Design a protein with these regions (language model features):
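Conserved small/polar residues in nucleotide/adenosyl-binding loops
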Residues: 410-417
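Gly/Thr-rich phosphate-binding beta-strand-loop-beta motif of the actin/hexokinase/Hsp70
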Residues: 3-19, 130, 138-142, 155-158
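Glycine-rich phosphate-binding loop plus the immediately following alpha-helix
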Residues: 39-43, 158-234, 368, 372-377
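Short glycine-rich, Thr/Ser-proximal phosphate-binding strand/loop in the N-terminal lobe
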Residues: 11-39, 164-168
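A contiguous, well-structured pocket-lining segment that forms one wall/lid of small-molecule binding clefts
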Residues: 216-327, 340-348, 382-383, 398-405
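Catalytic phosphate/nucleotide-handling subdomain of diverse soluble enzymes
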Residues: 318-392
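Conserved phosphate-binding catalytic cores of ATP/NTP-utilizing and phosphoryl-transfer enzymes
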Residues: 107-130, 136-145, 347, 372-374
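Short beta-strand-loop/turn "lid" adjacent to the catalytic site in phosphate-handling enzymes
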Residues: 48-103, 108, 116-121, 142
Length: 417
C-alpha cells in the first residue's frame, strides 16, 4: 500500500516536501509560487499536493515553535494548516481537528530536522551532522531560579540508519543576562534520547547571529546574509576592529561571540555595538554616501565576520569528527548556505581525510525535507540507504520548444507582425 507523507516548514523560507514510499517526488518553497521572497505560511504549496495525491497518510510540521502557536482557522479554531489540509480532503475530516492523528508536529527538534535533511540525502551510511543556525527550537529553561527562553544555535549529532540520531553537543543562547556555563554531561532527556551531551549555555549571539548583526550593520535585513558574504572580498583585515569571536586569550575553554561588539536580539537578528568602538562608528562626514557598503568600516566588518565565522565552523567540524569518530560530515542550518566558507573548508578537510556533504537546502525550507524523511524513517525503520541527491529539481518538468513559444506569442497577440 502506497504511503504519502507531506511535510511543511511554516516560518520564513516556508515550503513543502512530498514523499511517496520514502521517495521524494515534489518539493518547493512558497516564494516560488507567491513570488514573495522568503515567504512564510506554505498555503499555496499545500494546494500543489493535489497535483500528486488526493490524500495523505501524514502531514508533518516543521518549525521552531509548537503548531498550536500558529495562526488558527476562524470559528473552528484549529491551526490554519490543519484546517487547509482538512478542507482539501488531504486528511480525514472525521478525526479530532485539535489532536488530529495524521498531523505530526516536530517543531521541538528543529536542528534534528536540518540534520535529517542533510544526512538522508548525503548517500552516507553513517555520518556526523554539524548544524550552524541562527535560532532553532525555542527551549525554555530554569536559569538562576528564573524561567528563561533559550534557542538552539549550533548542534552536533551523530546520524545512523534507520533513525538513530544522538546529540553530542549543543550550544544554546539567550538574551540574558546570566552567567555562562559549560556542562560536559548534560542529560539528553529533552532531545528524546538516552545518555548525555555537552552543553554550552550563554547569553552571547551564536555564529550565525553575529553574521546577521554585521548584515544589518551593512544596511540589509538580517536574513540577507548572502549579501554580506558578497561584500567580504571588498574589505580587508583591520586590526582596529575587535575580534568578533573570542576565547578571551585562552582564558575560556570555548570560543563564543564577543558581546562587547555583538548584542543578540533573540530570536530575530542581533546588532553591532557600533558606538562602543571608534573604528566602527558612523563617520562624521560621509560625503553624501547613502549606500553604507561604500564605507570602509562596513567592508572591513564584512571581511572580519566572513573570515572569523568560517574559522569557527571549521573548528566545529573538527570537534564533531573528534567527538563522533566519524569521517563523514554533513553540514546544514543557515550557515550551510555560505558557499565561500564551504569551498574554504575543502582543502583543510581533505588533509585529514574528512568527507563533507553540504546540504544545498540548508535554509528552513530544508526542514520540510528533513521532517518528511525523519517521519518516514521513524515509521518504516527502513535500513536502505537513500541515494545521494543529484540535483535540486523536484516537481513538474516544463519543456517548451521554439514552436510552442512561437504559437503562444501569436495566440496572445504578443508577436511582432
Amino acid at each position: 500500500m502506497t504511503q504519502w507523507i507531506a511535510a511543511i516548514a511554516r516560518g520564513h523560507n516556508s515550503g513543502i516536501c512530498l514523499l511517496k514510499d520514502g521517495e521524494l517526488v515534489f518539493s518547493i518553497e512558497e516564494e516560488r509560487l507567491s513570488r514573495k521572497k522568503y515567504d512564510g505560511g506554505p498555503l499555496a504549496s499545500m494546494i500543489k499536493i493535489l497535483d500528486y495525491t488526493d490524500t495523505l497518510d501524514y502531514l508533518v510540521v516543521a518549525h521552531t515553535q509548537p503548531l498550536d502557536q500558529a495562526g488558527s482557522n476562524d470559528f473552528t479554531g484549529e491551526p490554519i494548516y490543519v484546517a487547509l489540509a482538512r478542507k482539501l480532503g488531504l486528511i480525514d475530516r472525521k478525526e479530532d481537528i485539535y489532536k488530529h492523528p495524521q498531523v505530526i508536529d516536530y517543531s521541538h527538534i528543529h536542528h534534528k530536522l536540518h540534520s535529517s535533511c542533510a544526512f538522508f540525502r548525503s548517500g552516507f551510511e553513517s555520518a556526523v551532522s554539524v548544524i550552524v543556525d541562527g535560532a532553532g527550537t525555542f527551549i525554555p529553561m530554569e536559569i538562576d531560579r528564573e524561567q528563561e527562553m533559550t534557542w538552539e544555535l549550533e548542534t552536533i549529532i551523530k546520524c545512523e540508519y534507520p533513525d538513530k540520531f544522538k546529540t553530542l553537543y549543543k550550544h544554546q543562547g539567550g538574551r540574558g543576562p546570566w552567567g555562562a556555563v559549560r556542562i560536559e554531561k548534560f542529560v539528553s532527556d529533552r532531545e528524546g534520547e538516552e545518555g548525555t551531551h555537552e552543553l554550552i549555555l550563554d547569553d552571547s549571539a551564536g555564529i550565525v547571529k553575529a553574521y546577521e548583526a554585521v548584515t544589518q550593520y551593512c544596511g540589509w535585513a538580517p536574513i540577507e546574509a548572502g549579501k554580506t558574504m558578497g561584500l567580504f572580498p571588498y574589505g580587508k583585515e583591520n586590526n582596529e576592529i575587535p575580534d568578533i569571536y573570542t576565547n578571551y586569550d585562552g582564558r575560556s575553554d570555548w570560543a563564543t561571540t564577543n558581546r562587547d561588539i555583538i548584542v543578540p536580539t533573540y530570536p530575530n537578528g542581533a546588532v553591532v555595538n557600533k558606538g562602543r568602538f571608534l573604528e566602527i562608528r558612523e563617520p562624521m562626514d560621509t560625503n553624501g554616501i547613502k549606500d553604507l557598503t561604500k564605507l570602509d568600516n562596513r567592508r572591513d566588518m564584512a571581511y572580519a565576520i566572513q573570515t572569523e565565522s568560517q574559522s569557527m565552523v571549521l573548528d566545529l567540524i573538527f570537534k564533531a569528527v573528534e567527538m563522533s569518530g566519524e569521517k563523514n560530515v554533513v553540514l546544514s542550518g543557515g550557515y550551510g548556505l555560505n558557499c565561500v566558507a564551504n569551498y574554504w573548508y575543502l582543502p583543510q578537510l581533505k588533509e585529514k581525510g574528512i568527507n563533507l556533504f553540504v546540504e544545498p537546502v540548508s535554509n528552513d525550507a530544508g526542514t520540510a525535507i528533513g521532517a518528511a524523511y525523519w517521519h518516514y524513517q521513524k515509521t518504516s525503520k527502513n535500513m536502505k540507504v537513500h541515494p545521494v541527491m543529484k540535483d535540486l529539481y523536484y516537481g513538474p518538468k516544463h519543456e517548451y520548444d521554439p514552436e510552442y513559444i512561437t504559437c503562444l506569442l501569436y495566440t496572445s497577440d504578443a508577436a511582432d507582425e
